[in-house]
Amino acid sequence: MSAAASPRSLTLIGAGLAGCLLAILLSRRGWQITLYERRGDPRIKGYESGRSINLALAERGRHALRQAGAEDAVMAKAVMMRGRMIHPVSGEPQLQRYGRDDSEVIWSIHRAALNVTLLDLAEQAGARVHFYRRLHTVDFDAGYARFIDDRDDQPHEIHFQALVGSDGAGSALRAAMQRKAPVGEHIAFLDHSYKELEIPPRADGGFRIERNALHIWPRGRYMCIALPNDGGTFTVTLFLPNEGMPSFATTRSGDEALALFARDFPDALPLIPQLKEHWEEHPPGLLGTLTRERWHLDGRAVLLGDAAHAMVPFHGQGMNCAFEDCVALAEQLDAHSDLSEAFAAFEAARRDDAAAIQQMALENYLEMRDRVGDAQFLLQRALEQQLQARWPTRFVPHYTMVTFLRTRYAIALARSEIQREILLEATHGHTDLSRIDWVALETVVHARLEPLEGAH
């Protein structure tokens, strides 16, 4: 940093997951970091997120946590998931592994537990956190921001050098930037929404169903999933269309929800004793993809994570992508003394990757709800595993690139599209792998796929 900009300080709007991780990374680099959070301290008040979709922690997120010295504290609260446990309407559940063995797994962690852990570590690193501070107005030219304490409507004004928006999909900083200069915002909502329920632990505190899996009840246009928590519970999320049959329009009451589960999720129904009550208490949550043409305002403000590029949750990468953002922004702040240059370089480095994972998250929804029980999909999965075993540095499964490696999302998307074409062509007209032309496939794989860095 230049002497004119000293001391190095940033003001972060939002003390959620990304805000706290960025605070740790920058505080450890000597920055003076202050966070402003509109909600109360979750360690005192209890968690107020309004959404408790469990988070899937992958290698990208773990790498970012390692950079911040936070991995051990977080992993102590995480539960391993080996793969998708597919529950048909009738018959036994079947596990579809994510990777080759237990070195290739993902981890489930409850949002509240993770937030509290990172909040503690941010304060320990030297960051200052102010709660009950809702961003109200920003004078970017003068460097002043006004916050409101919603408990008493009292205003609080601060002077800032630069603002970082880590305040989620409904970002107040993004709205302030939009008022200053349009950021080209576009929101595309899915025609589906979600509602959350819970599977409690057994009387002895154990898990009622297999703990080391992400459970999926795929039913075509809709589905139910359940992720484990370290206390023996599962967070259940039902994704339904907004209209049609069945939908949230036709399933309004708790009794209608009971009938839906009895018909379409019969093995899940007895696991959710409070289904009726929770259905009527919890409103449906919206699902959407958020894009904008610009993430920063000169050197005065920058957005990251959901504030910049919110996505649907079906690839389990929203948090992982946001954590990558934090590392990328910290690296650009190391490389550039001028904040405007750092913010511009950060956006340039991350824009294509954010767009790629947003697209892949939408595609993964179709796979999870429509295809995981499809015979042709399972045949392609079997061939994919064979191709990876034969040429592991060239044919790297989509899920491996996104989840177990840190391959750039844009590269993972491009390679996945090529690999999907190879799988479709090779399995066309086949019901098993007995007549696959391996010699021809070797030629195609070597011609179309270069070795991928990090694959093994």
Curated annotation (Swiss-Prot):
Q: Which GO terms describe its biological process?
A: anthranilate metabolic process; kynurenine metabolic process; L-tryptophan catabolic process; NAD biosynthetic process; quinolinate biosynthetic process
Specify the pathway: Cofactor biosynthesis; NAD(+) biosynthesis; quinolinate from L-kynurenine: step 1/3
For this protein, the Enzyme Commission number is 1.14.13.9
Which reaction is catalysed here? L-kynurenine + NADPH + O2 + H(+) = 3-hydroxy-L-kynurenine + NADP(+) + H2O
Domain of life from the UniProt record: Bacteria
**Matches recorded under Gene3D superfamilies:** FAD/NAD(P)-binding domain (3.50.50.60)
Which cofactors, by name? FAD
| Family matches, as HAMAP family | Kynurenine_monooxygenase (MF_01971)
Summarizing the function annotation, the protein's role is: Catalyzes the hydroxylation of L-kynurenine (L-Kyn) to form 3-hydroxy-L-kynurenine (L-3OHKyn). Required for synthesis of quinolinic acid.
Under what name is this protein listed?
Kynurenine 3-monooxygenase
Species the sequence originates in: Xanthomonas campestris pv. campestris (strain ATCC 33913 / DSM 3586 / NCPPB 528 / LMG 568 / P 25)
